[in-house]
């Protein structure tokens, strides 16, 4: 099993798909990496030799921000927005949608579960 950037790549998948298991690498970036290293995209992960794994690892370390570094960068960006109190930062702080979606109804994913509010009680009939 190939281990790249702290992620165990699935053995029986094509290397093109297996690389997408690394956070920060999608299908297009995976194809780009394989083109740079001259590795066929149809090779299964278990059939890679050590030299090919090392070449993929070197390209990832030198050219791309992946896994922990990328997650740290994203969280620092959000923290910066919150500190300088931009509109997006305030929406992050309040846990509301950032990009202009309506919040009077919907927005349940961002705001969390439904909170029931007690309504008026009907007066008993006489």
Curated annotation (Swiss-Prot):
GO terms for biological process: translation. One of its GO terms (molecular function) is rRNA binding. Keywords: Chloroplast, Plastid, Ribonucleoprotein, Ribosomal protein, RNA-binding, rRNA-binding. The keyword Transmembrane does not apply. Pfam families: Ribosomal_S13. It is found in: Plastid, Chloroplast. The keyword RNA-binding applies. Its main location: plastid. Part of the 30S ribosomal subunit. Located at the top of the head of the 30S subunit, it contacts several helices of the 16S rRNA. This is Small ribosomal subunit protein uS13c. The gene is rps13.
């Amino acid at each position: 099993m190939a281990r790249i950037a702290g992620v165990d790549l699935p053995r029986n998948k094509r290397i093109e798909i297996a690389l997408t298991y690394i956070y920060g690498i999608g299908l297009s970036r995976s194809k780009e990496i394989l083109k740079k290293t001259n590795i066929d995209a149809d090779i299964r992960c278990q059939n890679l030799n050590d030299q090919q794994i090392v070449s993929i690892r070197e390209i990832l370390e030198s050219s791309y921000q992946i896994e922990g570094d990328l997650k740290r960068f994203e969280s620092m960006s959000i923290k910066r927005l919150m500190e300088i109190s931009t509109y997006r930062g305030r929406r992050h702080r309040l846990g509301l949608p950032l990009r202009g979606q309506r919040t009077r109804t919907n927005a349940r994913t961002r705001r969390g579960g439904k909170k029931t509010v007690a309504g008026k009680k009907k007066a008993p009939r006489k």
